[in-house]
A protein has these predicted regions:
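A short, structured N-terminal alpha-helical element that caps or precedes a catalytic domain
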Residues: 1-180
Length: 180
């Protein structure tokens, strides 16, 4: 969660967008997100606070459809009033905020780290128990942007706690890469 919160923050998005030259993003969707980068940077901290339940009053602003920058995930919006009319403003806003985060996630996957996922980072590397060649190869590559965030957070925790022993639990294939 800490990695996601660091990544999906004003400072995190500024670093992401700063790593790419203006012309590097490839798809139309990525070009749109990059063009709206200032809007994403301006809104991300508020959206995360809303999704954490720390700013519920933002729901009305999110639902105006003028607050969040929109890219391809918003193309799948059908009749929002039909879908959320009875469920209320909070649920509609959570749905829109999730689409917003998924747009950013798509951008990260395409331009920063193809293995990124909210809960399944590099999952494909741990799915095949008969060979760890892909995992070994990935571990021998240069660290990714997200690797650096993860390792910095880990270093801070280790320095603060100064444990004698560190153990990692790997309950799902999507956790295997991060454990190494």
């Amino acid at each position: 969660i800490e990695v996601i919160l660091k990544l999906f923050s004003k400072a995190g998005l500024q670093k992401i967008f700063a790593t790419l030259p203006d012309s590097q993003s490839s798809s139309e969707n990525s070009h749109r997100i990059f063009a709206l980068k200032n809007d994403y940077v301006k809104t991300i901290d508020q959206v995360i606070l809303f999704l954490q339940g720390k700013n519920p009053t933002l729901a009305r602003q999110i639902c105006t459809m003028n607050f969040l920058p929109e890219s391809s995930r918003f193309n799948q919006l059908d009749d929002m009033e039909f879908a959320f009319g009875n469920m209320g403003l909070q649920d509609k806003a959570k749905h829109l905020a999730t689409l917003y985060l998924e747009d950013i996630s798509d951008f990260i996957i395409e331009n920063i780290d193809p293995d990124f996922g909210f809960s399944r980072y590099a999952e494909r590397l741990g799915k095949s128990a008969n060979s760890f060649d892909d995992l070994y190869a990935k571990l021998n590559e240069n660290r990714t942007f997200i690797d650096e965030i993860s390792l910095n957070i880990l270093a801070q925790k280790l320095e603060f706690v100064q444990p004698k022993l560190v153990c990692f639990s790997v309950p799902f294939p999507g956790n295997l890469y991060a454990a190494f």
